[in-house]
Curated annotation (Swiss-Prot):
Record field: catalytic activity: L-glutamine + H2O = L-glutamate + NH4(+)
InterPro entries in alphabetical order: Beta-lactam/transpept-like, Glutaminase
Keywords from the UniProt entry: Hydrolase
SUPFAM superfamilies, alphabetized: beta-lactamase/transpeptidase-like
Binding site for substrate: 66, 117, 161, 168, 192, 244, 262
Assembly: Homotetramer.
Ribonucleoprotein keyword on record: no
Pfam family, one: Glutaminase
Highest taxon in the source lineage: Bacteria
Gene3D superfamilies: DD-peptidase/beta-lactamase superfamily
Protein name: Glutaminase
Length: 310
């Protein structure tokens, strides 16, 4: 049994130490994100037995952004299986910025990773669907199953992104021209943009992590969301590419599968134990929450969790 007092103390200490840390700036290329109050900071744990611990304004809802890639990857694995995902998308870190097209040019149009923009758009196109709305509803539903029923599309975020996503549209057409997109290019880009535009809070984000930690069983709803055999593939991708250019550094220092988003959210998974999540809008140059990284790493270190420790 996990010690409840110890878990709450770890969360409280991480929050106290880092919630006012200076550094970084909000993503400014998406108007909605540029206007989120920069002083916000939250950290939370959800355990595999369904207990919740948090510090900060855990009710504040923020844009899921790139963390949505984890959910869509999970659905693709359920739909087509791990071999098809590896063959059609890839399972390798790019070593490049999350929105780069260089890897596409170097590898014949194959995106390599489902956790960078090119691979994520391709993954969205892999989802079994007869039309754009079915594709979108299935992705929204998996987000809700993994994290909580309150996860919903923000029209304000979506509008802000749909009017500025020219680079992703270009990526979609590059994928299409190379034969690595599996539906209409603008359908894939539209749905991908929507999946990034849902709102979530930090406890729900930690619940997503706890669901992965529990092998696909949501510890709060007690419903199986994913086949247990598919979860290791998700965690492997998170370890390799979850924090973009910081992924290697994160694996070296923290040693947990993680995923960040430019909305300021960050997630880590302790397999078999818990999900740890944080939110704070100012980002480093790679697009990861400055305070969020520190808070999640602090919780993991205090509790002694690192998958490489054995």
């Amino acid at each position: 049994m996990l010690d409840a007092n110890k878990l709450q103390q770890a969360v409280d200490q991480a929050y106290t130490q880092f919630h006012s840390l200076n550094g970084g700036q909000n993503a400014d290329y998406i108007p909605f994100l540029a206007n989120v109050p920069g002083q916000l900071a939250v950290v939370a744990i959800v355990t595999c037995d369904g207990n919740v611990y948090s510090a900060g304004d855990s009710d504040y809802r923020f844009a899921l952004e790139s963390i949505s890639k984890v959910c869509t990857l999970a659905l693709a694995l359920e739909d087509v299986g791990p071999q098809a995902v590896q063959d059609k998308i890839g399972a390798d870190p790019t070593g490049l910025p999350f929105n780069s097209v260089i890897a596409l040019e170097l590898h014949g149009g194959k995106p390599l990773s489902p956790l960078v923009n090119a691979g994520a758009i391709a993954t969205t196109s892999l989802i079994n669907a007869e039309n754009i709305e079915q594709r979108w509803q299935r992705i929204l539903h998996i987000q809700q199953q993994l994290a909580g029923e309150q996860v919903a599309l923000s029209d304000e975020v979506n509008q802000s992104e749909q009017t500025t996503n020219f680079h992703n549209r270009a990526i979609a057409w590059l994928l299409y021209s190379a034969g690595y997109l599996y539906c209409d290019a603008m359908e894939a880009c539209d749905v991908y943009t929507r999946q990034c535009s849902t709102l979530i809070n930090t406890v729900e984000l930690a619940t997503l992590g706890a669901t992965l930690a529990a092998g696909g069983l949501n510890p709060l709803t007690h419903k199986r969301v994913l086949q247990a055999d598919n979860v290791p593939y998700i965690l492997a991708e998170m370890m390799m590419e979850g924090l973009y250019g910081r992924s290697g550094d994160w694996a070296y220092r923290v040693g947990l599968p993680g995923k960040s988003g430019v909305g300021g959210g960050i997630l880590a998974v302790v397999p078999g134990v818990m999900g740890i999540a944080a939110f704070s809008p100012p980002l480093d140059e790679e697009g990861n929450s400055v305070r969020g990284q520190k808070m999640v790493a602090s919780v993991a270190k205090q509790l002694g969790y690192n998958v490489f420790k054995g």
